[in-house]
């Protein structure tokens, strides 16, 4: 009897151990899974991250990491700006309006923009579809950067030349014009048209009015030395359809599920003919189509000040993923070779393909920060040396001509360097100073500190030369007067 009881006890104990192991396994797996998303957030240096997977029926899984700029935990209701994924909404809306007979996709742009008659764009024969495909010949941005819709139209009118029609060249300006064209043709605002046509089809109602987005979406972040700085770029209504729709990760995943269903069924917007961009890429209705060893991914990414985004799906597996995170700056883009971020690599692996490129190991944005830090320290040491030699050194005997040359060289080099540091980034990148502060606050702060140091150094050199000249004259006068 004792032996039987012992065996029963051992069997019971074994059952408990097995049950505990079984129950613990999912928790361990869940912990490992959470570590994966935390690592992605760390690699992105993102304060907040949302990853939502989907299939043709909707959301299948979701993970959230970190906080927004108000220190609220990222979750299902957290709002992000979706960036250039917005272009696929605008393209789909244009195609729906074309079905309703409100827009002719094959019409020349001059039908909807008579002010372009006789301009470089008006003369090249670009159509509405060319705006969708980025084949209208327009540049990516205008330089200087426009402040409102009229400045965009005026900037396009003033372009001395444009590329030939048919050559794909990604252009944000094309989609600003496409949104305005839609509004002109339909006689209603972009937001109202989305709510009337696209939202009922997709089941998704993104934030599409500038005042609502500006007041409800928490600020994003830009890299700032070893951390991040909360930044906000005020959005205007004319640029919503180009890259500023906003919403949650779930909403974007539901939209992705609609796009997946439409593609699988061969329905709008997948029916728009595609244009080749490179050997492995095509572009359709606001989406890229890329081949990975026989597997095609359909996707678009987005990057606006403070926010990064990705939405894509694999038609063959029926799986899709959305990645949203609340940091983006010019330094990020330099660090990641433009668009090859850890998020892109993560998304492609999630969709079952081997990424063609990995994130860059050489972070050029960080290199610039370190270089400018070294220059700031060097300039400060030089200022200290100039002051020290001025106070402790006997004024050297130099000719007036040599002093004039020294002063002139200091002024030319100093003023030139200051102007280059203050206005060079604006001229080079075509951004305004406020926009550069939003997208690259640490780099711009360093430029201004370095410019101030050079201005002080230039002033010290000039004043020191004048003081030494005065000392030399006084010494000469005393020598002349002495018996």
Task: Locate each region found by the language model.
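Bacterial N-terminal signal peptides that target proteins for export
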Residues: 2-14
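Catalytic loop of the DD-peptidase/beta-lactamase superfamily, centered on the K-T-G motif
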Residues: 31-55, 234-483
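Short, surface-exposed loop or secondary-structure junction motifs
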Residues: 65-67, 120-308
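C-terminal segment of classical bacterial N-terminal signal peptides
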Residues: 19-28
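Extracytoplasmic/secreted proteins, especially bacterial periplasmic and envelope-associated proteins
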Residues: 32, 36-39, 84, 89, ...
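Short active-site loop at a secondary-structure junction
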Residues: 44-47, 71-130, 161-173, 384, ...
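Short, conserved catalytic-motif segment at the N-terminal edge
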Residues: 31-82, 102, 118-119, 153
């Amino acid at each position: 009897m004792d032996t039987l009881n012992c065996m029963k006890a051992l069997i019971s104990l074994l059952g408990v151990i097995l049950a505990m192991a079984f129950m613990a396994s999912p928790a361990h797996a869940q912990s490992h899974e959470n570590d994966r998303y935390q690592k992605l957030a760390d690699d992105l240096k993102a304060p907040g991250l949302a990853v939502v997977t989907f299939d043709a029926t909707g959301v299948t899984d979701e993970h959230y990491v970190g906080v927004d700029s108000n220190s609220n935990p990222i979750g299902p209701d957290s709002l992000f700006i979706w960036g250039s994924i917005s272009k696929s909404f605008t393209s789909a809306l244009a195609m729906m309006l074309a079905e309703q007979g409100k827009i002719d996709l094959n019409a020349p742009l001059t039908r909807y923009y008579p002010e372009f008659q006789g301009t470089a764009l008006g003369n090249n024969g670009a159509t509405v579809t060319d705006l969708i495909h980025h084949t209208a010949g327009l540049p990516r941005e205008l330089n200087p950067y426009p402040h409102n819709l009229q400045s965009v139209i005026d900037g396009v009118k003033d372009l001395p030349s444009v590329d030939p029609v048919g050559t794909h060249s990604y252009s944000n300006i094309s989609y600003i014009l496409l949104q305005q064209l839609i509004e002109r043709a339909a006689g209603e605002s972009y937001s109202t048209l989305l709510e009337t046509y696209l939202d009922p089809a997709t089941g998704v109602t993104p934030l599409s009015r500038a005042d609502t987005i500006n007041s409800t979406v928490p600020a994003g972040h830009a890299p700032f030395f070893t951390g991040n700085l909360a930044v906000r770029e005020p959005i205007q209504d004319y640029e919503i359809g180009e890259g500023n729709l906003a919403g949650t990760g779930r909403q974007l995943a539901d939209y992705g599920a609609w796009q997946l269903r439409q593609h699988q069924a061969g329905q709008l917007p997948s029916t728009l003919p595609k244009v080749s961009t490179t050997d492995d890429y095509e572009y359709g209705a606001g989406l890229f189509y890329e081949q990975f060893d026989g597997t095609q991914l359909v996707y678009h990414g987005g990057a606006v000040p403070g926010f990064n985004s990705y939405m894509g799906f694999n038609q063959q597996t029926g799986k899709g993923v959305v990645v949203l995170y609340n940091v983006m700056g010019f330094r990020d883009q330099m660090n990641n070779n433009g668009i090859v971020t850890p998020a892109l690599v993560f998304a492609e692996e999630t969709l079952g393909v081997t990424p063609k490129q990995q994130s860059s190991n050489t972070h050029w944005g960080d290199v610039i920060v370190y270089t400018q830090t070294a220059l700031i320290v060097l300039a400060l040491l030089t200022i200290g040396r100039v002051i020290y030699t001025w106070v402790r050194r006997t004024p050297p005997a130099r000719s007036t001509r040599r002093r004039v040359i020294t002063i002139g060289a200091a002024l030319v080099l100093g003023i030139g360097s200051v102007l280059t540091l203050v206005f060079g980034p604006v001229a080079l990148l075509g951004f305004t100073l406020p926009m550069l502060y939003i997208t690259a606050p640490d780099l711009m702060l360093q430029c201004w500190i370095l410019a101030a140091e050079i201005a002080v150094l230039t002033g010290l050199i000039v004043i020191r030369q004048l003081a030494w000249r005065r000392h030399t004259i006084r010494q000469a006068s005393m020598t002349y007067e002495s018996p």
